[in-house]
């Protein structure tokens, strides 16, 4: 595990690291929950190491995240949303004011305030959960539809290019490098 205390000092957390632990069930980034003592009050944060194998250029990714989250928060405040800070992620700046920090090994880290009483799901189990996910996605689209400035940086080339993704799938099925096609024939 990474030295979470050392990494936490890279961010403007305005307190002292107490402890941290691996958090959640995600499989892309390394996610940790950390506790910070702020004048006698313990506050939780999410600390994430961006996966450099997936995101080859993490700094433009973080610039995208900052633009989108700042804009969504601005829109929620304009709508006088009483829970604006619960409805969008908010990046905690690094000690040098950036939306990320690089550790001595070159790993890119980010910190968000922990959103208490929030829930995440790895799998949808009910129709209501599916409806809520669709509603949340629609709300996000509405909040970011008027995002000003240049287009966002393409963090994973062709990720949203359906033609390219289908071609890659067909190639993987054809070559079947791990011999798994026969096990998933029904899905194909």
Short names for language-model regions:
Residues 14, 21-25, 46-49, 55-59, ...:
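ATP-dependent phospho-/nucleotidyl transfer catalytic cores
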Residues 35, 75, 168-169:
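Short alpha-helix boundary/capping motifs
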Residues 1-2, 10-13, 24-28, 88-93:
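A short linear-motif detector with a strong N-terminal bias
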Residues 8, 69, 134, 185-188:
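A generic alpha-helix structural signal
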Residues 41-66, 71-149:
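ATP-binding pocket architecture of kinase catalytic cores
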Residues 1-21, 68, 72:
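Juxta-kinase regulatory segment immediately upstream of eukaryotic protein kinase catalytic domains
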Residues 13-38:
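ATP-binding glycine-rich phosphate-binding loop
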């Amino acid at each position: 595990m990474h030295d979470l205390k050392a990494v936490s000092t890279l961010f403007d957390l305005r307190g002292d690291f107490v402890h941290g632990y691996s958090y959640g069930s995600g499989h892309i980034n390394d996610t940790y929950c950390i506790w910070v003592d702020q004048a006698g009050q313990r506050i939780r944060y999410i600390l994430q190491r961006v996966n450099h194998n997936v995101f080859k250029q993490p700094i433009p990714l973080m610039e995208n995240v900052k633009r989108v989250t700042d804009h969504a928060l601005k829109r929620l405040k304009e709508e006088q949303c009483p829970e604006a800070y619960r409805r969008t992620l908010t990046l905690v700046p690094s000690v040098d004011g950036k939306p990320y920090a690089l550790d001595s090994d070159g790993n890119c880290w980010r910190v968000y305030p922990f959103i208490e009483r929030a829930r995440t799901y790895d799998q949808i189990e009910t129709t209501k959960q599916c409806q809520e996910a669709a509603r949340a996605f629609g709300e996000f689209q509405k909040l970011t539809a008027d995002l000003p400035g240049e287009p966002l940086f393409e963090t994973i080339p062709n990720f949203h290019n359906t033609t390219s993704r289908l071609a890659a799938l067909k190639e993987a099925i054809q070559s079947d490098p791990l011999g798994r096609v026969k096990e998933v024939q029904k899905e194909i």
